[in-house]
C-alpha cells in the first residue's frame, strides 16, 4: 500500500476505484508485492543454502491465485489437509513440490497422500506404522519440536516448546528415522515450526 495524490493505493490502484468496481467488502492482493516478498526471502536463504526451496503454508491463505503466483516463483506448497493438496495440484504443483504436514491423519488421508506422491511430514512417530501399511514413500520428513518456541500473541499459538501440540521431541525423532530407514525409505527431511505471529 502507498499514498498517491492523497489516496490510498494498492498495486497502483486507488482503494476508491477498487471499491467502486468490486463493491465492499472485498479482498485485495498485490501480486507484485507477493512476488517481491517471496524473492527477498528466497534470495536471503539461497546465499547460505543454495539448494533452498520454500514451501508456502496454504493454510494461511488458500486463494488458488496466490498459490499459483508462488508456484510460478518456484515455491512448493505445505498442505495441512487433502483438500489443500488438491488445491496445490490444481495450480500445477506435483509430488515433491507438495509437503503434507497434516495432524491426526486418517487412513484415507494417508492413502490419498501416497497416491498424490507428496512428501509426508509426520509430527508423531505413531503415524509411521500406519503410513507404511499403505506404502513406502521415497522421501519422508519429520516435524521436530526443538524444545522452545515463541509467539507474540500468547501461548495458544506457540508451535514448539514444552506442551506444544506440534512436533516430535529430538530424543524420539532419531528412532523415527531409524524405523523409516529400516522400512526402505531412502531420503529424509527435517522440519521445524517454532513460532507464529512473531514480529
Predicted regions and their residues:
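ATP-grasp fold ATP-binding core
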Residues: 140-145
